[in-house]
């Protein structure tokens, strides 16, 4: 957090670095060919069962290849995997024991009812109760 508001306050964590890796973007879904887009560090939060991938690029994690490049050999072995993105990619959906789509505010809000539209042809779902 950078302290912009109460939802974005900085926190201190004691961590152990597990791996320094690359952020990659597969050329196609489930492809082994990729482009390197940035760097990442995978850390373990001390005295917990939590590992976190911190990257300097905003690429969506789509599947195993990207986790491997970040030092996570099998993401399917984790009890819970959280990815901050607006879409659940097929490989993640297929490999997950359970998955949830969370509608959060941000630069690409998925909850369209909260978008402050300026020019709307009425009626328009979900803006209007149809």
Positions of predicted regions on the chain:
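Glycine-rich, Lys/Arg-enriched anion-binding loops that position phosphate/diphosphate groups
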Residues: 1-36
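Extended hydrophobic packing segments that form well-structured cores
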Residues: 23-130
């Amino acid at each position: 957090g950078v302290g912009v508001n109460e939802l974005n306050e900085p926190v201190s964590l004691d961590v152990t670095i597990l791996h320094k890796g690359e952020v990659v973007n597969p050329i196609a879904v489930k492809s082994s060919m990729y482009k390197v887009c940035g760097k990442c560090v995978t850390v373990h939060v001390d005295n917990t069962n939590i590992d976190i991938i911190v990257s300097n690029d905003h690429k969506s994690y789509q599947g195993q290849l990207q986790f491997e490049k970040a030092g996570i050999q099998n993401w399917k072995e984790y009890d819970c995997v959280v990815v901050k993105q607006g879409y659940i990619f097929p490989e993640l959906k297929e490999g997950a024991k359970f998955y949830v789509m969370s509608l959060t505010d941000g630069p690409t809000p998925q909850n369209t009812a909260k978008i402050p539209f300026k020019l709307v042809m009425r009626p328009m779902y979900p803006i209007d109760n149809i």
